[in-house]
Amino acid sequence: MIIIGLIGRIGAGKSTVAARFAAHGGHVIDADRIAHEVLEEPDVIRQVANRFGADVLDVDGRIRRRDVADRVFGPTPDHARALEWLESLVHPRVRSRINAEMVALEARDEGRIPPERGTVVVLDVPLLVQAGWADRCDRLIVVNCSEEVRRQRLAARHWNPAQQEAREAAWDRNYSAAMLPSEKLSSVDASGDLAYTHSQVDLIWSGLSG
């Protein structure tokens, strides 16, 4: 099994790169998708409602993520404490699910004859380095994007300024490119030309070996 980790700011184009790997047969583990699933767990719903109030739930009793985001992303100490609490609730569950998925994939690979390269796993995890996933990866791909294009993508998400600033600050916290082992690094430019972005991913894929 080969594990590839994607690194990049919000709006850089990590999902586009992940989708191209998936088109080649890579197995993408999308932490955002898993986090959304975690927020549907009854115990998590109960704790979130207790912390933020029942008005963050819709008529079906599901968490309205945008309402929760308003409470955890912002400039005040209360926002910071709320975000820390939410992360302490959600992140361990997300990590557990990712680990379980990777264990299952590795077990499946062990039964292959011949083993060949095995599954290529792509970790699409926000704050991959800051969350400690980089050490698990065989390859790290930094997804770059022009600031102008990235800002356009973020505008399309309709986050309020406080939410965007808090998410950007989360990236800046405890991150330095110097932390990354150069022997694992590749980069992809995802500034806009989809065919060009795909061609870079294709080249990386063709060079993978087990």
What are these regions (language model features)?
Residues 9, 21:
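P-loop (Walker A) phosphate-binding loop of NTP-binding proteins
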